[in-house]
């Protein structure tokens, strides 16, 4: 690979070294859980400890955590079980803001359960969806609502607590399932504040690895009929043997964030350290995206480069470590290839089944996505801006084919 500047964090964050070591260690252990031996007992204790760690990370004092194939698979499962367990009739509500993980699942299970799917149209100008917009669509017959916490295309996060409150003010019994895949690495999660029924992430986007998804589910949804092994514990959401290594890597993530928060303030409190880490991460990412958009000194930011249009606008307080833009009249593929040659990793989002819901209303065929995490630096952002300036100079003298 060689030296590179990594601005593809929305496609997968950098992996903690401890996660690599933990995964290797547990892959070599043949023992299974639920056996009468010390190794099996140790595995069970590691899983339970990871769930306690996750409760601290997610800010959840109720409900339970479980792993699955991926964040998308878990969202499908949560939506499916909510749709089939909710009171018959009514409707299911989602938004055009969402990733297809929840949008596809909600539409499919609306059809399968004979319900109307009702869409909340997001706002093009700020790349977001609000509580007010949800309240205009949700009605007293709404059985299930899906919400995306932050978009991997616009980079904008929603006020989840406000949306949940608006939904329940109209439909108190409505179940709420949240896609937290993009949001998880960029801000503190506070499940207890949201009054929701499911929240799923993809750990590879939160400093862990591919190969599993991680979800929280409410006690309310657990008490409803859901998929489980016959005659098994009624509260269980786990199907088959659990991957202890997956759970253990969640603990690695929590330990890292504790360490980071401890650098901000010398505290013995885990919750204080995790909160400080979340605040520091948010502050660093705001500084990076502001620098990217506005530039510094004689280095032009995105807003001052010719022909550049930014999804969500130049000033958006809800931006979470991600800026998507295009140079009007220039292929985004061409620009990403140019940046690759400079050792700068970005990504093209096309108007396909993943991003068309955002790009098509704008009349865009594609865009360039630059996604940062707290470990990125201002010097890396400046390198990106200098490369973009160089691209525009080359294009102006005909050294870059803009078609």
PLM regions with names:
Residues 1-403:
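Pyridoxal 5′-phosphate
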């Amino acid at each position: 690979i060689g030296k590179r500047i990594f601005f593809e964090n929305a496609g997968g964050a950098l992996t903690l070294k401890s996660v690599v070591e933990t995964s290797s260690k547990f892959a070599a252990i043949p023992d299974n859980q639920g056996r009468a031996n010390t190794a099996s007992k140790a595995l069970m204790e590691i899983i339970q400890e990871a769930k306690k760690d996750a409760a601290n990370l997610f800010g959840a004092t109720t409900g339970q955590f479980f792993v699955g194939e991926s964040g998308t698979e878990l969202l499908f499962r949560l939506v499916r079980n909510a749709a089939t367990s909710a009171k018959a009739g009514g409707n299911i509500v989602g938004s055009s803001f969402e990733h297809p993980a929840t949008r596809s699942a909600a539409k499919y299970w609306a059809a399968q359960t004979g319900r109307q799917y009702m869409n909340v149209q997001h706002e093009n100008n700020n790349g977001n969806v609000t509580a007010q917009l949800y309240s205009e669509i949700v009605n007293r017959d709404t059985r299930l609502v899906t919400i995306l916490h932050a978009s991997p295309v616009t980079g904008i996060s929603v006020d989840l607590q406000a949306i949940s409150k608006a939904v329940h003010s109209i439909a108190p019994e409505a179940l709420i399932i949240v896609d937290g895949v993009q949001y998880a690495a960029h801000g503190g999660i506070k499940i207890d504040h949201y009054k929701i029924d499911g929240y799923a992430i993809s750990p590879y986007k939160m400093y862990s690895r591919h190969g599993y998804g991680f979800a929280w589910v409410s006690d309310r949804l657990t008490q409803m009929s859901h998929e489980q092994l016959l005659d098994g514990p009624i509260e269980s959401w786990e199907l088959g043997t659990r991957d202890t290594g997956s759970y253990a890597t969640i603990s690695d993530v929590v330990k890292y964030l504790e360490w980071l928060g401890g650098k901000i303030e010398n505290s013995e409190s885990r919750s204080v350290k995790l909160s400080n880490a979340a605040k520091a991460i948010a502050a660093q990412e705001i500084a990076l995206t502001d620098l990217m958009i506005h530039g510094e000194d004689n280095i032009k930011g995105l807003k001052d480069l010719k022909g550049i249009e930014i999804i969500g606008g130049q000033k958006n307080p809800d931006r979470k470590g991600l800026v998507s833009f295009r140079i009007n009249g220039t292929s985004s593929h061409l620009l990403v290839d140019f940046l690759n040659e400079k050792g700068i990793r970005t990504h093209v989002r096309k108007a396909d089944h993943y991003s068309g819901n955002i790009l098509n209303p704008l009349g865009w065929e594609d865009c360039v996505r630059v996604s940062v995490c707290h470990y990125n630096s201002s010097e890396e952002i400046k390198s990106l801006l200098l490369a973009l300036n160089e691209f525009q100079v080359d294009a102006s003298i005909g050294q870059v084919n803009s078609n």
